[in-house]
Amino acid sequence: SILEDDTVPHIESRMVYTVNTEAAAVLEKLAAAPRIRELGLQFSSGWNETTDKKAGYFDTGWAHPTSWDDVILQGPHLGVSTPMIKQPNPTLKHNQDWSEVDLEAMPADFIPATAYQPDRAAKPTYDADYSKWSTNAGPSPSNSYFRIAWRRMAATTGFRTLYPSLIPPGAAHVNPVH
């Protein structure tokens, strides 16, 4: 910070000055607006793609789940506003072996194919061990709610590098999805 020392949190730093009266009016309105931290938002890191797979929570294998409870979303699934822009090909040859989903032709109850499958037989605590959120009624599985997610890794060659998507209740995700 230019005006404060290291003991002042960045969020509380003062601005040096505004450029004009219009900017000052905008800054006054922004200052009066509630802060994001006041919304009480919560975060789920999802399954760790390395350690949780080794621990037996899920395994690699192509499938077309019939329930969102059996879906583990990966980054390539996500496109702008949808958790099903692509799905892995049955061959699972490499990390780019995915095909686009025809959004106009898919049925209303469509669930994308996945490359990771829950292994509830090897890990009966699969559902209980998924991340929890704090609620008034106590801890609740984070995948019980609609969530906004985005890819951690996205191509920076285009003008859109943030791919926010709405994830439906039931679906899990791996840690490269935030």
Over which residues does each language-model region extend?
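Polybasic, glycine- and aromatic-enriched phosphate-binding surface used to engage nucleic acids
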Residues: 1-178
